[in-house]
Amino acid sequence: MNESYLDDVNDYDDQTGEDELDPVEIPKEVRHLRTQSYDKSVRDLVAMIDEGDIDLDPDYQRNYLWENKKASLLIESILLNIPIPVVYVAENEESQWNVIDGLQRLNSLYRFFKNEFKLSRLEVLSELNGLTYHNLPPKAKRMLGNGMFRVVVLLAETHPEIKYDVFMRLNTGSVRLNEQELRNCLYR
């Protein structure tokens, strides 16, 4: 997505003579946000990451930041059937999904499924503290694998500047990106 995105933006910049676009300035005929929503199980999401269908390391995203406690609480929330916020991804021309919002959540799931951390400081399911995915009771493994995430996909035909605008809007409300992370968005 990175090279094709830059090619699309550069081609448009060459045509307009502008370096940066405001989404309102994009010609109306290409200013369409095309999305599709899916309900994906945790098991499916982990498999998609393993197969390279979801990119957990896009250039424009920050590194993994969550401490084990926060990641553990996400796992506990899934086991307790607590709704998890929507994950937003942008589809590229190869049909790969690049994470726009939800990278920390997906990374936490993936790391847990790969036994990279033990559950810690759980508040409700405290009997699971100290366990990795491998050591979870079979019922808990099934419940976790069957947990559902809503995924909103910005389809490949969506103009790159519209995708960028969505990224900016989603990532200016919670933990703010630093200036370098925001600049990296331009080169995704």
Regions found by a protein language model. Give the residues of each.
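Basic- and aromatic-enriched surface patches that contact anionic nucleotides/nucleic acids
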Residues: 2-44, 58-188
